[in-house]
Amino acid sequence: MSAVAGTADSLQNRFRSHFCGRLHTEFENKTIAVAGWVHRIRDHGGLIFIDLRDHTGICQLIIQPEKEELFRKAEALHTESVICVSGVVVRRSEETVNPRLASGEIEVVVEDIRVESNASPLPFPVADELQTSEELRLKYRFLDLRREKIHENIHFRSRLISEVRRYLEERSFMEIQTPILTSSSPEGARDFLVPSRLHPGKFYALPQAPQQFKQLLMVSGFSRYFQIAPCFRDEDARADRSPGEFYQIDMEMAFIEQDDLFEILEGMFKHLTEKMSNKRITQFPFPRISYKEVMNRYGSDKPDLRIPVEIEDVTELFVNSSFKVFAGNTKEGNCIKAMVLKGRGNESRQFYDKAERRAKELGSAGLAYIQYKEEGPKGPIVKFFSEDEMNDLKERLQIEAGDVVFFGAGKWERTCKIMGGMREYFSDLFELDRDELSFCWVVDFPMYEYDEAAKKIEFSHNPFSMPQGEMEALETMDPLDILAYQYDIVCNGIELSSGAIRNHRPDIMYRAFGIAGYEKAEVDKRFGHMIEAFNMGAPPHGGIAPGLDRLVMILRDEQNIREVIAFPMNQQAEDLMMAAPAEVSPLQLRELSLKLDLPKEEKKEKRS
C-alpha cells in the first residue's frame, strides 16, 4: 500500500513507535515497535517471514528458530490477525531487496510479539486480489477495505476532499453545513421520507440536494459557499450512480455570471488533476458546446470527446431523394443523420448485424449503411440512390475506400439520441486514452420543451434557472426558442454536474412558471418561502455541484462507483453488512403513529 500523505514517521505509544511503510535504512540497528495486520506468513526452512501491514504499507518481519517461544507464537498466527511487534531494523542483502515495497531495503528481526486479535478463517483472502463476488465483498466490507486497491481509493478520496477544501477556501469560499432533515423538494427523484414522532402524520425528507438552502445562504449575505454535501435520492443504481446516498462538492456564489463560475471550476479540476493524478486535460480552458450543437455532433448531452467519430447532418442532400424513406422524412420536417467509420467498410456481416441489433435496442426500426469498397459502394440501400446523391454524399462526408456510413432518420431529438447511442457503441473499436481527460461544458439548454403526451409546454430542465434575455425573452419569444443560463460539466462521457445561474427575481419566476402552466397560487404554495426571501433582497447568484464519487471514479480509473465509496449499498439499495433496510418493532411504529400497508405479494410471503 502507498504511504499516506501527512502521516508522521513515528508515533510513540504502547502499540508502536513507527509505521510499517515508513521504515527505511535510516533506522538500521535501531529497536522499533510496529503494529498491524498479518498480511502473509511464509516458513522458509526454519525462518518464519511475516509481512506486516498497516495503513502506510508493509514491512517484513523475521522470526528466528532459536527464539522458540516467539517461533511457536508465529506458527499459530492466522493471516489478518492483529499483532504488535518489537524488534531490530536490519538492512537486507542486495539480492533480497524488494523494490515493490517502500520498506523493501530493510526487515525487522523480531524480539517480541503480542497478539491483540487472532483472526478466524476469512470468507475471502485479503492479501491476494482474487476475484470475489460483490455480495461477499459488500457483506464483509471491513475486510474488502483492507485490500490494497480499494484501500488506496478511500485514501485518495480523503486527500482529494482536503485539496478541494484548500482550493476553495483560498478563493474565499466558506464551508457551511445545511440541514439533513428538511421538507420534500422538487428536484425530480423520489424522496426518502422520515416520519415525525412529535408531529404525527407529517414527514421530513432527506435532502436530494441542498439547493434551496444554498440559495438562501446567498440571500443571507454569504458570498461564496461550499459543502461536501450528502444527497439522498430514492433511485435505481447504475455503474456511475449509487442508490440512495451520494456526495457532491456543492457550491454557490453571489454576484457572478456564468463565465466566473466556469473559471473557478475549471481551475479546481485542473488543480486536482495535476496534484492528484498523472492524467492530462485535453483542452484548457474547457470547450463550450451548445446543447443543440452537442446533440447534432455527438447525439448526447454528455459526450465522450475522445471518440474520433462525429455525426453529420445530411438532410439537405436527400430533399428530393429517390429513396422514399429519406425523402418522406425530409417532407415531414425530420432530419437525416450520417456517421462515418473510417476503415471499417470491409467488416463481416456479423459486425453489421450486431450493430443493427444495438440500433433496435436504442429504438430504431433498423440501421441503414453503405460500405465503400475498392470496387464501389455496397449495401442494402445503395440501389435506391441516384449517382448524383452518391457523389454528393461522398464529397460531403469525405468518404474514402474502406469506409462505412451509417444512417439515421426521423424526428430530430430521437434520431440524434439513437445515433449518439451508436457512436458510443462503436467506441469499443477505438483505443481511448484512459489518461486523457476530455472535459467540456454543455451550455445554452432550452428553457422549455413540448410534452407530446400531456400536449403542453413543460420546463426542460431546472425551472429555477434564469432565462437568457430575462423578462424580455419570456414576453417576446416563442417559449421553445428560449434558452436558459444552465450548464453541465462533462468528462469522458460522464456528467459530473449540472448547474445554473439562478432566477432571483420573483416577477421573472412567476412569468416563467406561468408559461409552463402554473398558476401564481400554486407557485406560492410550493415555493413561497423562496419567493418571500427573494422579495427581501436577493443578489444575482449561481452555482454547481460536481459529484464527488464520480470525480474520484474518473481520477482512479474505476468503472463502478462502489469502488470509491467506503460502505456502499448494492444495486438493490441494500446494505448487506448492516442488514439495512430492516423491519422495525411494533413499538417504534406506534410511537410514529404508523401502520404498514404492504403489497399483497409481500403479505403472503410474511404468512407463509
From Swiss-Prot:
Name the predominant localization.
Answer: cytoplasm
Please state what the protein is called.
Answer: Aspartate--tRNA(Asp/Asn) ligase
* Lineage top rank: taxon: Bacteria
Q: Which Pfam families match?
A: GAD (PF02938), tRNA-synt_2 (PF00152), tRNA_anti-codon (PF01336)
Provide this UniProt record's keywords sorted from A to Z: Aminoacyl-tRNA synthetase, ATP-binding, Cytoplasm, Ligase, Nucleotide-binding, Protein biosynthesis
Query: Which reactions are catalysed by this chain?
Result: tRNA(Asx) + L-aspartate + ATP = L-aspartyl-tRNA(Asx) + AMP + diphosphate
Please give the NCBIfam families that the UniProt record associates with this protein: aspS_bact, PRK00476.1
- Which locations, inside or outside the cell, does it occupy? Cytoplasm
**Which region ranges are annotated with the description Aspartate?**
211-214
One GO MF annotation is: nucleic acid binding
Q: Which GO terms describe its biological process?
A: aspartyl-tRNA aminoacylation
Q: Which purpose does this protein serve, as stated in its record?
A: Aspartyl-tRNA synthetase with relaxed tRNA specificity since it is able to aspartylate not only its cognate tRNA(Asp) but also tRNA(Asn). Reaction proceeds in two steps: L-aspartate is first activated by ATP to form Asp-AMP and then transferred to the acceptor end of tRNA(Asp/Asn).
Q: How does it assemble?
A: Homodimer.
Q: Where is L-aspartate bound in this sequence?
A: 187, 233, 461, 502
Q: Name one GO cellular component term.
A: cytoplasm
This entry's Enzyme Commission designation comes to 6.1.1.23
SUPFAM superfamilies on file: Class II aaRS and biotin synthetases, GAD domain-like, Nucleic acid-binding proteins
- Family named by the database record: Belongs to the class-II aminoacyl-tRNA synthetase family. Type 1 subfamily.
Q: Binding positions for ATP?
A: 233-235, 495, 547-550
